[in-house]
């Protein structure tokens, strides 16, 4: 039989007691409560010191959210182009078909493009962080600059330079806006 110690029932600062049936008013002995951590657990202490996602998590996050945002925006734009393509005498079924085809085509196209931009950005940002061992505004600006340049490189040097400048400015504005939002909006 297990010995009940008072320290087993006390919650330290890194754990909290979890009662799986607390909403059902089921009496349960405190020795059967679970101790859950209040912060993420890491296998290596070096991982816990870094306050950022890993390169794989960044790759998945930026690519996935980029694809989702691009698909939604493209589908929204496709709805309007589908409505514009209506002709006199179209039945309701044909109108719905035009809207669905147009929004699906635009959603796929925009989703793929923005997803690729997220993929390139995540790769460059993770590479810059690995080389410089810093994660600041300039890291995002360099990643945005590189993303724009790589994304438009096939269209020529001038197009790549313009897209790189736009990407760097956009990434810097987003990061600066995020810091301003964190400072003034207490959420």
From Swiss-Prot:
Keywords, alphabetical:
Membrane, Mitochondrion, Mitochondrion inner membrane, Transmembrane, Transmembrane helix
Q: Which GO BP terms, alphabetically?
A: protein targeting to mitochondrion
- Where does tissue-level expression of this protein occur? Expressed in roots, flowers, cotyledons and leaves.
Q: Which InterPro entries match?
A: Tim23-like
The record ties this protein, via Pfam families, to: Tim17
Q: How does it sit in the membrane?
A: Multi-pass membrane protein
Q: Does the keyword Heme apply?
A: no
Chief place of localization: mitochondrion
Location of the protein in the cell = Mitochondrion inner membrane
Q: Mind telling me which GO cellular component terms the entry cites?
A: mitochondrial inner membrane; TIM23 mitochondrial import inner membrane translocase complex
Q: Can you tell which superkingdom this protein's organism belongs to? A: Eukaryota
Keyword Amino-acid biosynthesis applies: no
According to the record, the segments passing through the membrane are 63-83, 111-130, 137-153, 160-177
Q: GO molecular function: any one?
A: protein-transporting ATPase activity
Family in the record: Belongs to the Tim17/Tim22/Tim23 family.
* Protein function: Essential component of the TIM17:23 complex, a complex that mediates the translocation of transit peptide-containing proteins across the mitochondrial inner membrane. Links the inner and outer membranes.
Q: How does it assemble?
A: Component of the TIM17:23 complex at least composed of TIM23, TIM17 and TIM50. The complex interacts with the TIM44 component of the PAM complex.
This protein is called what?
Mitochondrial import inner membrane translocase subunit TIM23-1
Q: Identify the taxonomic lineage of the organism of origin.
A: Eukaryota, Viridiplantae, Streptophyta, Embryophyta, Tracheophyta
